[in-house]
C-alpha cells in the first residue's frame, strides 16, 4: 500500500507498484478508438506506462503531452497512457491534440489497477488510479517505477526516460 496525498489530504492505494526486476503484469483495456488493447501486442518494445486518475485534469493531460514529446526521438519505445476514463475522454484529448507517440488505454473494465497496485482505496478519488509511472524494458522486466506522492504533481519524466 502506498501513502499518497490529494491536495494535501492523505489517501492510499490498494497495493504497491511492481518490483524492479520483476516481469511486468500483462493487461488489457480499450484504446480511444474503442478497439481492444492487449499489452502482449507490445512484446519486444520498451514501454513507459503513464498512469493517472483522469485525462480531464490539467496535470494528467500535461503528463500525456510531455511523454508524447519526450519519446518522439526514441527507437523501439512506446508510451501507454492508462486511466479509468472512458475511451471517449481519452480520444477527446489525445486524438484532439494529435498525440501520435502514445497509446491511450482505458482500463475501466480490467484488473489493471489491482495488478499494478495503483487503485486508490479511499478519499475523493477512491476507485481511480494514482499518478505513477512504470517503465518496462524490451524483455518485459520492470526497470523503473515512480509512485508520485501527491496526485497534483507531475512525474519525473527525465528519470523515467533515463531508465531506458
Label the model's feature ranges:
Residues 1-164:
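Chalcogenol-based redox active-site neighborhoods
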Amino acid at each position: 500500500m502506498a501513502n499518497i496525498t490529494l491536495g494535501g489530504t492523505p489517501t492510499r492505494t490498494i497495493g504497491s507498484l511492481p518490483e524492479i526486476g520483476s516481469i511486468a503484469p500483462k493487461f488489457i483495456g480499450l484504446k480511444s478508438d474503442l478497439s481492444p488493447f492487449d499489452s502482449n501486442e507490445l512484446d519486444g518494445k520498451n514501454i513507459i506506462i503513464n498512469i493517472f486518475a483522469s485525462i480531464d485534469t490539467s496535470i494528467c493531460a500535461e503528463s500525456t503531452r510531455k511523454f508524447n514529446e519526450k519519446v518522439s526521438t526514441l527507437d523501439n519505445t512506446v508510451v501507454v497512457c492508462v486511466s479509468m476514463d472512458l475511451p471517449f475522454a481519452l480520444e477527446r484529448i489525445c486524438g484532439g491534440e494529435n498525440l501520435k507517440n502514445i497509446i491511450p488505454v482505458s482500463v475501466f473494465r480490467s484488473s489493471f489497477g489491482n495488478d499494478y497496485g495503483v487503485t486508490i482505496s479511499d478519499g475523493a478519488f477512491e476507485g481511480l488510479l494514482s499518478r505513477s509511472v512504470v517503465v518496462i524494458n524490451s524483455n518485459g522486466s520492470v526497470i523503473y517505477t515512480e509512485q508520485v506522492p501527491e496526485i497534483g504533481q507531475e512525474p519525473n519524466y527525465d528519470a523515467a526516460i533515463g531508465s531506458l
